[in-house]
Amino acid sequence: MVAQPKVRTSARLPRGALDRETVVAAALDIADREGLGGVTMARVAEALGGSPMSLYRHLSDKQELLDAVADLAVSEIPAIVQDGRPWRVRLEEFALEVRRCALRHPALVEIVLATYVRGPAAASVGLDMIALLHEAGFDEDSSIRGFMALRNHIIGALAWEVSRFRGGGEEFAREVADNFVHEDTPADSPIRRLGDVVSEDPERQYMFGISHLLDGFEAELRR
């Protein structure tokens, strides 16, 4: 896990103390506290007690900054453990670690939704998942497709969870249900359960999707 220096004041740093790592850590701290909208070159410079122009010595533009912020957050995800346990157990454990990281850094989900995340940590996550699926018995193409299927579920589920919490949890669940359930909805319609399901443990919902994807993967391996 990468230690992240927290920069919460605008006290001016000593001359020469500003480097790329410090800038990115400050930007991640701002994203965690204020949301992605708070991450601007001016805001980061203010937090570091410098000028916006001083940041451009280390990052070419805001997009490079956001890529670096996302990669720093992703670097907290532990690598998939090579300990001889079944591939499925390790992949489920890894999926939970990804979720924990995203909940620590909700802005990460916003960045991933907006752009392709570049950086060594993000690449390592993908390579680890592909390697584990290949280890499980999938060929190269199927390993990549399996990774993409898992990635798409993870991003979608976490985007939903982050928006759910921002919407107020139970209140958000009621609003979602009200959008689908009306007075003329049949009493025995399963859609009437929507609010209850939306408001249940989000980790359970997240792992429901992971589990069913892996069920399909295992069925494919048995063919």
List the predicted regions and their residue ranges.
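A structured, mid-to-C-terminal "fold-capping" secondary-structure block
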Residues: 170-223
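Hydrophobic alpha-helical connector segments
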Residues: 79-121, 140-143, 150
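Amphipathic alpha-helical interaction segments
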Residues: 22, 64, 93, 124, ...
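N-terminal intrinsically disordered/low-complexity leader segments
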Residues: 1-18, 79, 188-196
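Helix-turn-helix
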Residues: 22, 26-64, 68
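Short, basic, alpha-helical segments at the C-terminal edge of helix-turn-helix-like DNA-binding modules
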Residues: 70-76
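Hydrophobic alpha-helical bundle segments that form small-molecule/ligand-binding pockets
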Residues: 125-179, 199, 217-221
